[in-house]
Amino acid sequence: MKSSVSIVRCENYDEEKVIIALRESIKLIGGIQTFVKKGSRVLLKPNLLYGKSPEKAVTTHPSILKGTIQLVREAGGIPFIGDSPAVGSLTRAAEKSGIKAVADEMKCPLVEFNRPVVPRDGGGKIFKKLEIDQTVLEADVVINLPKWKTHAQMFLTLGVKNLFGCIPGPRKAQCHLMAGEDAKAFARILVDVYRIVQPSLTILDGIVGMEGNGPNSGRPIPIRLLLSSGDSLSLDQIVCDLLGIARKSLLTNRVAFDQALGKEEIDVLGGKVENVKISSFQFPTLSQVNWGLPGFLSRALKNALTSKPAVVEEICKKCDECTKICPPEALTRKGKDLVFDYKQCIRCFCCLEVCPEGAISIKPGWALRLKSKFQNPNVK
């Protein structure tokens, strides 16, 4: 069975333009009534990674939330907003990102995810005891509202990756530790979360996205697109098409195809891919490559074969958010110095993800630098 993805242009975040684009985008895939029924409790799951102002392009823009709340109510649904930020409380992140102002204006509740449970019918396909927030499981409908961004470990954060926020606070660190240095293992966790949550509708905020070393330290880039789909995986595949990269360049897509979840045939409605392709976009620094070497050799050559996080001393404000979040505790403060234990580091780049100053950089190993001279690492 084919799935559908709509592509609609939207020039900026003017509220009137956004609601028009949202209506058109969702109408193309069946209309809001297809996804929301009268009386349904509807969870709106934005990307609320960190408390940054909307122009930084770190979080889903408030106008997307406001327009979606309006459409859900028109269909008779009862919306509420929920997430579990990487740093700080939901209230703080929502205040700085402008989402709390929208929630207050629209009288839409904000719910922080802090009730982890293993679903009754089990956790994920691969990770059997994966815990999801109970609030997510109790919602009648989940509308996924990701931001189009790069991601240092996972290459891009789109529909599937955004659902990682359905895992409450400290449980996220446990997931990184379960996956260790294996980015594909982490992608399997993300696909497991997708299987459990099964969002009814995904709306991607690509009006202004993020390029470079995201998801927190990249640069805003106008893309001027809004994408909608009943299938997050299909939406993620179409974004790869728009960027001119192989669909399986995105590890979550690759894992989904391995598990027979991905769809080869997708109906694209509204704008045609060839007419709205992104001509210039900077991907994140390559974090690792599967060289096909025996395990013992890969471990011995770890620093050469992978990228590693490094501190930019002149920018660092010594807030120590990075040391607090590091899952394997491979990052410590010794006096004024930030010290990485690269033997313990699992290359999850959580430190880069939460640094408020952009003071964590990505340093490729010599083998990766050599490879990048001969091959574009973004196209596989």
Regions found by a protein language model. Give the residues of each.
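N-terminal and secondary-structure boundary signal
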Residues: 1-313, 317, 323-337, 342, ...
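Helix-rich C-terminal "cap"/substrate-channel and partner-interaction subdomain
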Residues: 376
